[in-house]
Amino acid sequence: MILLISDLHLEQDRPDITRAFLDLLAGRAREAEALYILGDFFEVWIGDDAMSPFQLSICKALRALSDSGTRIFLMHGNRDFMIGKGFCKAAGCTLLSDPSVVQLNGERVLLMHGDSLCTRDEGYIRMRRYLRHPLTLFILRHLPLGTRHKLARKLRNESRAQTRMKANDIVDVTPDEVPRIMQQFGVRTLVHGHTHRPAIHKLQIGDQAARRIVLGDWDRQGWVLQVDEQGFSLNSFDFVPETTALLN
């Protein structure tokens, strides 16, 4: 069994999401061969040298899962693209490039965060290219912590404001980009997050059937894609209320 999740946007202000994730690590993930986290794991990440006590606790929880035998793979999202080798080493996880092709159930599957598929949002794509440039990352990682915190808040607020103003089709994936990149990598299954629109889309690429699986964001409920001998299954689950969690 392999589990894939994305867009948890973990932060201290959402203890319900954190509890649900820790429950997953202590339960089903212990039985899994691997756990893939496809970006926006944290709501914000300003550097491995600036881990808060909350982020450190998540790191330790991942390490415990890794030490139990479950392999963990982490991909950058647009919120946490500054996660580096230091965090991954401490957490016992492997950093995946975006995109990456992996073998799931004997099938070549393309994994992405998904933001690079939104090519109609030209302003975002330009900003993404700038922020991910090695020189930009080097500069950002060497800014004072206070400056990084202020910059992260500014970018997050601007992103939220712009997303609200943009048409739905602009912030969703570009239809033509999906078959293009799937053909480029020679796959018939694409799994991504980012858009917060969970679904399994059936496609036709040339004369072959294909599919695009969109992972859900963890906000009002959690989402997990499970891959096992039965195939690919995308399911949601409700968060356990705090009072119930305390009783248990």
Curated annotation (Swiss-Prot):
Substrate binds at residues 78-79, 121, 159, 163, 166, 194. GO terms for molecular function: manganese ion binding; UDP-2,3-diacylglucosamine hydrolase activity. Mn(2+) 1 binds at residues 7, 9, 40, 196. Its cofactor is Mn(2+). Binds 2 Mn(2+) ions per subunit in a binuclear metal center. It is a peripheral membrane protein. It catalyses: UDP-2-N,3-O-bis[(3R)-3-hydroxytetradecanoyl]-alpha-D-glucosamine + H2O = 2-N,3-O-bis[(3R)-3-hydroxytetradecanoyl]-alpha-D-glucosaminyl 1-phosphate + UMP + 2 H(+). GO terms for cellular component: cytoplasm; extrinsic component of plasma membrane. It is found in: Cell inner membrane. Keywords: Cell inner membrane, Cell membrane, Hydrolase, Lipid A biosynthesis, Lipid biosynthesis, Lipid metabolism, Manganese, Membrane, Metal-binding. Belongs to the LpxH family. This is UDP-2,3-diacylglucosamine hydrolase. It comes from Pseudomonas savastanoi pv. phaseolicola (strain 1448A / Race 6) (Pseudomonas syringae pv. phaseolicola (strain 1448A / Race 6)).
